[in-house]
Amino acid sequence: MTDTLSRLAEVLESRKDAAADSSYVASLYHKGLNKILEKLGEESIETIIAAKDAAVSGDCSDVIYETADLWFHSMVMLAALGQHPQAVLDELDRRFGLSGHTEKAARTAE
């Protein structure tokens, strides 16, 4: 799984300096963080709607499709902020085995 994320991160990084008209990702970078966040918000809503539809229909294909879009645009956002998806994976690893209540209490105490 992480190989796919790493490969995608490399592509996203390579598009930062590309001409805006050379790719969709390059055009997002050139439009700036606000446009990237707008797309991320749109994808979040589309994922939620797909999940609600899947709960009724039992067909999760749109949920998978929309979640892929959500992850993709999340990675574009991270790259725009100079972050690699490994930082998110590291955070998930840190939380693994930690009760949600304990993790939340640790955040509140900081």
Curated annotation (Swiss-Prot):
<dbReference type="GO" id="GO:0000105">
    <property type="term" value="P:L-histidine biosynthetic process"/>
</dbReference>
<keyword id="KW-0067">ATP-binding</keyword>
<dbReference type="GO" id="GO:0005524">
    <property type="term" value="F:ATP binding"/>
</dbReference>
<comment type="pathway">
    <text>Amino-acid biosynthesis; L-histidine biosynthesis; L-histidine from 5-phospho-alpha-D-ribose 1-diphosphate: step 2/9.</text>
</comment>
<protein>
    <recommendedName>
        <fullName>Phosphoribosyl-ATP pyrophosphatase</fullName>
        <ecNumber>3.6.1.31</ecNumber>
    </recommendedName>
</protein>
<comment type="similarity">
    <text>Belongs to the PRA-PH family.</text>
</comment>
<keyword id="KW-0963">Cytoplasm</keyword>
<dbReference type="GO" id="GO:0004636">
    <property type="term" value="F:phosphoribosyl-ATP diphosphatase activity"/>
</dbReference>
<keyword id="KW-0378">Hydrolase</keyword>
<dbReference type="GO" id="GO:0005737">
    <property type="term" value="C:cytoplasm"/>
</dbReference>
<dbReference type="InterPro" id="IPR021130">
    <property type="entry name" value="PRib-ATP_PPHydrolase-like"/>
</dbReference>
<keyword id="KW-0028">Amino-acid biosynthesis</keyword>
<keyword id="KW-0547">Nucleotide-binding</keyword>
<dbReference type="InterPro" id="IPR008179">
    <property type="entry name" value="HisE"/>
</dbReference>
<dbReference type="Pfam" id="PF01503">
    <property type="entry name" value="PRA-PH"/>
</dbReference>
<keyword id="KW-0368">Histidine biosynthesis</keyword>
